Amino acid sequence: MADSQINHKDALDYWASIDADVNGMLGGFSFISKVDLQGSKNFLAKLGVGGEGAGKAKVKIAVDCGAGIGRITEGLLLKVANTVDIVEPIVKFTDNLKGKEGVGEIFNTGLENWSPETEYDLIWNQWCLGHLTDAQLQSYLEKCAKALNKGGLVVVKENMSTSGEDVFDEVDSSVTRCDEKFREIFKKARMKIKKTEIQNGFPRDILPVRIYALVPEVVIVD
């Protein structure tokens, strides 16, 4: 199993060595950031989330999970939410977000250790879930489901393996999953796919990126 090779310390050591800028966050592919953010904005708009246009309302509170330096927080989430919380284990990445208008709480912890105490309208996860094992990802999604406000969404945006199986990357100690594996884990976590699509406009020589909007199969009642 590819995910059995994941080592959280190795992953933290890798990211701690990376520059706190967009190029560092995107592994040298900073030129895809604009297209990525626009694709995410368009995806949310199709779901009625956003601050522009008829029928597209801002949500009250979102959380950027595995936020890094806040590229997505600043480039997207603060435009569609009044407040954005941050979950990111590397402190140097979040230093520039402290005190920024619209940024709420900052949790410097890994996703596997985060226990949300706030109810969110939007939980955003991008290019970070590969650092969780399959079992951790299922547990994490179950926690996210319980932390959603009524009508809330969990968004997952990740690279897709094209080899038909999950692939371990020893450089940052992460796994690139295939679409089938994600769907299997979503089902185990009792999350259903409300909408999904492939990100358009990326270079052909990089892995395809798929975005999913998830909702709980059953509405959680306290």
Predicted regions located by residue number:
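Class I (Rossmann-like) S-adenosyl-L-methionine-dependent methyltransferase catalytic domain
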Residues: 1-118, 132-143, 153-222
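A conserved beta-strand element that flanks and buttresses the S-adenosyl-L-methionine
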Residues: 124
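Short catalytic micro-motifs in class I SAM-dependent methyltransferases
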Residues: 127-131
